[in-house]
Amino acid sequence: MRDQFISLALILCVLHSACGLYFHISETERKCFIEEVPDETTVIVNYKVELYDPRSNGFMPSSPGIGMHVEVRDSDDKIVLSRVYSSQGRISFTSHTPGEHVICMFSNSTAWFSGAQLRVHLDIQVGEHAIDYAHVAQKEKLTELQLRIRQLLDQVEQITKEQNYQRYREERFRHTSESTNSRVLWWSLAQTVVLVCMGFWQMRHLKSFFEAKKLV
């Protein structure tokens, strides 16, 4: 019971986490992030690009002419999304296979801005945190109680997806372990057979040598 409670708490921590950060890149640099995503889960990527201004020794709040090429690949290395966006945007996609999704970003560099330093603000939201409940309440005309029930149902659904994903990972790990153990066993048997054959051959060779020398 205690282990189940700890597992549930960890899942809730994962569900309530969002990746908010910023990083610096040059225009020729490619930056990638890995996000563990269950299947049929919505992922929202919010980003904003700022250009370094050497005159003010800071970053411009807007970067006209600079866009970001965003590419998303799923756990099977298939492209989920790949296109050029503006310097600030909101990207949404839904996972169809569970596992690691790689989100890569790089600028659509031009000769004018070539070699410039960029600051990229990035916020990745997964699952029910990617849902704008204020918009949902307004669109579907939900009361506060109905909206809260909707949020709880979405949280339960996301917890179920996370649990299914953990079972999927455990199954893959078990399959990998069994496959590795099987290969180790067959390799050990092969080594044993080779050693027995070499020992038998050496005994035959020594016997022939002693007979030739008339020592036996």
From Swiss-Prot:
It is found in: Endoplasmic reticulum membrane. Disruption phenotype: Mutant embryos exhibit reduced dpp signaling during early embryogenesis. Maternal tkv is not active and is not secreted. It is a single-pass type I membrane protein. Pfam families: EMP24_GP25L. Residues 134-164 form a coiled coil. Residues 30-126 form the GOLD domain. Residues 1-20 form the signal peptide. A motif (Prevents secretion from ER) lies at residues 213-216. Its main location: endoplasmic reticulum. This is Transmembrane emp24 domain-containing protein eca. The lineage of its organism: Eukaryota, Metazoa, Ecdysozoa, Arthropoda, Hexapoda.
